[in-house]
Amino acid sequence: MKNLLKAMILKSLIKSQKLAEKCDSVFSLKCQLNINMDLCNPNQKRVLFSYLDIRKYEPKNTVHANFQQAVQMLKCLIDMGYCVDICYLNDEITIKYVLNRNKEYDIILGHGDLYKQACKLECNKKALKILFVTENFPLVVEKKYAERAEYLKQRHPKLDFSCSPVRSGYFDEEIFTVSDYAVIMSSLYNIEPMKAYVKKTYQINSNIIFNKDFHFDKAARLNSIKEYKKNFLWFGSFGLVHKGVDILLDTFKELPDYKIAFYGLAPSEKSIFEEMKSSNTKDCGRINVQTEDFIEKVVNKHCFMIMPSCSEGMNTSVATCMAHGIIPIVTKETGFEPCKYIIELEDYKIETVIECINKVLSMSEEEILAMSEGACKYAQENFCLTHFDNSFRKIMKQIMHSADE
């Protein structure tokens, strides 16, 4: 019934703009138009910002760092004097409502279906098209996920993991071909395949969600290291196979003296976890980074987090854990530049992960403390929201200058 109603609405929207506007009041379309409109400036430039629906965003309950990004990107566009339409990137009804207006934009920024369709409209032929990339290149994602799926099949030929699909949907190859520039939240290694599709790429760091009650206390951290250094952490979201949870479950079966806690598993994928888990692996549900529980249960009781993902942009959960003193162990594809406070796995194989775990646990408590403090300072400096904001503003100015040449 829900899909039938949705299809009827979509069909009606194409025929009637007035009906579309009525739908806005009934269904609350995921967009906000004409932000920062200046009626005294007939030459004001217009931007379509295709990203997230931030109308009900509450800073104290940030579920993902990308909401903070969207707010600051919008603030930058306002400060640059643009009139902005900000819309959710993949909502079909919103897309029809916005694009049927045939509004001409000077800049189209973001990603998703709305971005791609708007870029292809004749009325936006002259618009500057800036792709904001938060994932790895889609062809690479498909290849890397296929490798992981095959590796899992080799180890568990009878396991049904169809409920854990490849993480995709916002990006495909075509979205790069319709873009002029790309602002990419990833490592230079991950950015390389994307360079051939656009005039120029710009690298930007991800931002963290930070718990304001946290401060790095050396004495307290050393006590945590002494008591909990054999406790490991996976901190993520949906995409169990994509993000290497299956590899960690099999790894810790071989390491019965160590423990690993999993935060953020998707409910739809927990059947796989239940089938593969062992006594030293625990599903801890989800947790709000900005709460006291996060400090008590996650920060104070873990020294290392492991993210053996097959493909990422620049993983925000890794950056967030670093900013709270947790040392990351990651694959190269997780999207970070080489750094002495980030431990990079040579590959994703179980024996490699085991070797790395044993190696880090051979470090002295003082060495772990120094690395924990270094990771904390590095992340707070390089992955803070202010750093993201400053970088985005600088990039936008560079793009405008390049476009004017």
Where do the protein language model's features map onto the residues?
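Nucleotide-activated donor-binding/catalytic signature segment of Leloir-type glycosyltransferases, i.e.
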Residues: 270-297
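Membrane-proximal basic amphipathic "stem/tether" segments
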Residues: 1-44
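Aromatic "clamp/platform" in nucleotide-sugar-dependent glycosyltransferases that forms part
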Residues: 310
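Short hydrophobic beta-strand element within catalytic cores of glycosyltransferases
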Residues: 326-330
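Conserved donor-binding/catalytic core segment of Leloir-type glycosyltransferases
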Residues: 218-243, 249-253, 261
